[in-house]
Amino acid sequence: MKTLLLSLVVVTFVCLDLAHTRTCYSCTENICLQHEQCQDGQDVCYKRWNTTYLILTDVVRGCAKTCPTPIEEEEVYCCLKDNCN
């Protein structure tokens, strides 16, 4: 009986951990307080911005399956924890 109970606890823990959905900041402003629950398979939080000017411009934050590739004069920061972007 104890073995069955322990097995159920382990299975429940594993299933709950696999069902975790990443949460990332999602906005287009420098200061961001808006969160987004990422879709299944989107485990990367990212922040991309234009480096043409001295100040951060064209900042975009959100969820992705993989880290976005920066385009010309753009930088991208990616991370794998909730709201790390």
Swiss-Prot record:
CDD domains on file: TFP_snake_toxin
Signal peptide (UniProt feature, chain positions): 1-21
The UniProt record lists the keyword Hydrolase: no
What are the disulphide bonds in this sequence? C24-C45, C27-C32, C38-C63, C67-C78, C79-C84
Q: Which family does it belong to?
A: Belongs to the three-finger toxin family. Ancestral subfamily.
Which key words are in the record? Answer: Disulfide bond, Secreted, Signal, Toxin
According to the entry, what is the taxonomic lineage of the organism?
Answer: Eukaryota, Metazoa, Chordata, Craniata, Vertebrata
- Predominant location category: secreted
Q: Which GO terms describe its molecular function?
A: toxin activity
**Which cellular components does GO assign to this protein?**
extracellular region
User: Which domain of life does this protein belong to?
Assistant: Eukaryota
SUPFAM superfamilies, alphabetized:
Snake toxin-like (SSF57302)
User: What is this protein's name?
Assistant: Toxin 3FTx-Lei1
Q: Which organism is it from?
A: Leioheterodon madagascariensis
Q: Does the keyword Translocase apply?
A: no
What subcellular compartments does it reside in?
Secreted
Regarding tissue, the record states: Expressed by the venom gland.
